[in-house]
Amino acid sequence: MTVQEKIHEYLSVHRDEMVEDIKTLIKVDSARAEALPGKPYGEGAAEALLAGLSLFEKHGFLGKNWDNYAIDTVINGKELGLDILAHLDVVPGGDGWTKTTPFEPIVEDGKMYGRGTSDDKGPAVAALYAMKAVRDLGF
């Protein structure tokens, strides 16, 4: 089996778990709000960062919160690495949602609906699972 096939199989096995992790982040209204002490982008953005840290820990990664500006983690602690950037804040929920409300994610006909699904909470979780696959498969 090729590396690509192993990773594809790994992600297929963990698909449902990944979907639930994306939903966890989408449920947080992380639209930028008024700055608060220790929360430079507001309450929701700080809550999203904490949810991201919880996902790191759930999957066995050590996370760091940089004063509620950003969070990060590493796979193996080597000096040379690859940065994967994503953000957990979103634009306001807005009106006109026909399948669900912005922060109540659903999956229908193989598609997920909710604010941040594709920009950028879904891709952030996909990056986390890519790191998890690399680590768990020993690459």
Residues covered by each model-derived region:
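Active-site metal-coordination/substrate-binding segment of hydrolases
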Residues: 81-139
